Design a protein with these regions (language model features):
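Carbohydrate-binding surfaces of carbohydrate-active enzymes
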Residues: 1-292
Length: 292
C-alpha cells in the first residue's frame, strides 16, 4: 500500500487520507493535548500559534489539520504577518474554534514584518479588520530590549521605547483596549457554517518519490494551496455580503457535533445553514450528522 502514497492510483486517495488523519490525531494527542493538560495542572493558560496556518497544502503537511490543535488551547491564537487584509482563513479557523467551544478570547500576533515606518493608521486598519473577523485581543510583534546588531532588521517594528512614537502609543492602546473589552463582554452569533475541506486535502496530498526540487513547492503542495485560495475567496465573499460564518473542522465535528431542532450544533454554537464546498470526501461522523 505504501507506493500509493507516492504514486497516483485507485487506492491513493484512501491511503493518503488515512495517513494524514493519523498524523493529525497523533500530533494533537502527543503535543498540543499534553501541553494543554500540563498547563492547566500547573495553573497556566496554554496559547500559541501553529505553522503555515494560511496555506492549506503546507498547513496539512506540518499540522495534519490545524483547527483541532486550537481545541487543546485555553486561548486560541494565530500569527498574521505584514499588512494583510485579504487572507480570511487564518482568523476564521481560530475564531471559529473559540466560538464553538466557548473559550472567549481570540489572540492574534500582529504587525510583524510591517517595517519601521508602519503608522498608527496602519495598526488600526489591520487590527480593525482582524477584530471584525473574530479576534478580540492583540499581541504585538515585537518588543525589542535593544536594537544592537541584527536586531534592528529582525522583523520590525519594535513596539517599545526605542521607537520615536512610543510616548504617543497610548492613543492606539486605549482604542484597542476598549474594543477588546466590549467584544469580550458579548458573544458572537453566526448562523452559517462552512465545512472546512481539510479531509479532501488529506486525500490529495502525496509526496514525490524522487525528492523535492524546492522547499515548500513539493509536488502536490501548490495545487492544494490554490484550493485554499479558492476556499478563502468563498469565505471572503460571504463576509462581504454580510453573511458572517464559522468554519467547521470535521475532527471537531466528530467530537462536538450534533443535531437539535433542525439546527446543526458544534459545541455551544447552532447553525441553520451548512455549506459544504470542495468536499470530495467526508468523515463518516460528519456524513451521519449532516444527514440527520
Amino acid at each position: 500500500m505504501i507506493p500509493y502514497f507516492y504514486f497516483n492510483g485507485e487506492k491513493s486517495a484512501k491511503i493518503r487520507h488515512d495517513y494524514w488523519r493519523t498524523v493529525s490525531e497523533r500530533f494533537k494527542e502527543a503535543y498540543s493535548v499534553q501541553i494543554g493538560d500540563w498547563c492547566r495542572e500547573n495553573n497556566l493558560l496554554f496559547t500559541g500559534h501553529f505553522l503555515q496556518e494560511d496555506k492549506m497544502g503546507l498547513s496539512c503537511r506540518v499540522n495534519g489539520s490545524v483547527m483541532p490543535h486550537y481545541a487543546a488551547e485555553d486561548i486560541q491564537a494565530i500569527d498574521m504577518l505584514t499588512e494583510r487584509t485579504e487572507e480570511y482563513i487564518t482568523v476564521k479557523q481560530c475564531s471559529s474554534v473559540s466560538n464553538q467551544l466557548g473559550r472567549g478570547a481570540v489572540l492574534s500576533e500582529m504587525y510583524g514584518c510591517t517595517g519601521w515606518d508602519f503608522s498608527f493608521e496602519g495598526q488600526k486598519w489591520v487590527g480593525d479588520w482582524q477584530y471584525a473577523l473574530g479576534v478580540n485581543q492583540r499581541c504585538q510583534h515585537l518588543a525589542l530590549y535593544s536594537l544592537r546588531g541584527c536586531r534592528k532588521r529582525d522583523y520590525p517594528p519594535s513596539i517599545n521605547c526605542n521607537t520615536s512614537w512610543w510616548k504617543e502609543y497610548k492613543t492606539v492602546e486605549d482604542y484597542f483596549a476598549r474594543l477588546s473589552y466590549m467584544l469580550r463582554c458579548g458573544e458572537p452569533i453566526r448562523t452559517v457554517l462552512v465545512v472546512h475541506p481539510m479531509t479532501t486535502v488529506w486525500s490529495r496530498l502525496g509526496c514525490s518519490p524522487y525528492g523535492n526540487p524546492k522547499r515548500n513547492q513539493e509536488r502536490d503542495i501548490p495545487k492544494l494551496n490554490e484550493l485554499g485560495d479558492t476556499f478563502n475567496s468563498l469565505v471572503k465573499n460571504l463576509c462581504k455580503k454580510h453573511y458572517d460564518c464559522d468554519l467547521g473542522d470535521e475532527v471537531i465535528i466528530s467530537e462536538y457535533g450534533s443535531c437539535s431542532d433542525d439546527k446543526f450544533v458544534i459545541g455551544k454554537c447552532e447553525y441553520n445553514t451548512v455549506i459544504m464546498p470542495f468536499c470530495e470526501n467526508l468523515l463518516s461522523e460528519t456524513y451521519t450528522k449532516v444527514m440527520e
